[in-house]
Amino acid sequence: MSQVQSGILPEHCRAAIWIEANLKGDVNALREASKIFVDNVATFQAKFPDAKLGAVVAFGNNVWRQLSGGEGADELKDFPVYGKGLAPSTQYDLLIHILSARHEVNFSVAQAALAAFGDAIDVKEEIHGFRWVEERDLSGFVDGTENPAGEETRREVAVIKDGVDAGGSYVFVQRWEHNLKQLNRMSVAGSGDDDRPY
């Protein structure tokens, strides 16, 4: 891989969609669908430049080994289960991550993704997300304050520089469940945040 996928480096995207799926057919259908999807994303980027659209197609360990013929991604491995089910491992074959400033554009791109991948995949989960007021998550706190800022700094930590994987990245996806009732009872004093947006 020589070109960084458009969804790796953007900052401050307001909305996102994550689609996770398993492979139904052979990997060649997945390979062709990925190419079609990348072309579709470029079309949407040209049509909606204000959306700051980006997308990522990522593969699980087993599918990557089939796609690559066993080359590269030496550190890619299945996620182990931790904490007696507190950190379950869903381990799907494919992740499509779509992000931009406009949810309706994301939705259109997701529809294009599902059309491109078609019968090659079995969708297991589709999640729509957004950043709340002032880029806060639903806990009421600003999210991502410790993330590297600026494209060059982000590139330094997120993109592989050399070798067969140059331009590629590893993706680690987590989903957190917040107890909003409990969080809303907590004081924000001393948290580094002056107030909540509500």
Predicted region positions:
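Long, histidine/aromatic-enriched segments associated with O2/redox biology
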Residues: 1-198
